Amino acid sequence: MDEFLKAAISEARQGKAEGGIPIGSVLVRDGAIIGKGHNKRVQDGDPVTHAEIDCLRNAGRVGNYRGAILYSTLMPCYLCAGAVVQFGIKKVYAGEDETFSGAKQFMESHGVEVIDLQSEECKQMMRTFIADHPELWFEDIGEL
């Protein structure tokens, strides 16, 4: 498994350990992680603290995100895809899109290369979480 997807999975596990939704993300440039984050909607009571947004916040002001690659354990939603497009990130690796198809077509239509890794570990992590906490999941994707 890719070391950067492993790092994103580690972030997702941290989020779950904190009582949140197990989605993690890392931002990579020049072969090094420059930001990492996980979904903190539950922990922070903030509806927009998705994993990718937390990751970008933690990367901070890096000047230019071009050349950076975003890894996420789940296909980014429209909120996070908007940030990807806004900051000029041109490549996204998603752990899976079976649980949530996200905004793949939106990103691709804006010139972002999106690669779905079809990670069984990511799929199983989400299946288990959704079975245990359906109300949190449906709140997260706006389907309450």
Where are these regions (language model features)?
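Short, basic/aromatic recognition patches
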Residues: M1-E18
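Secretory/periplasmic and organellar redox-cofactor proteins
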Residues: I9, V114, Q124-L144
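Short secondary-structure junction motifs
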Residues: E18-P22, Y65-G67
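Short beta-strand scaffold segments in enzyme catalytic cores
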Residues: I23-G31
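Zn2+-dependent cytidine deaminase-like catalytic core
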Residues: G35-R127
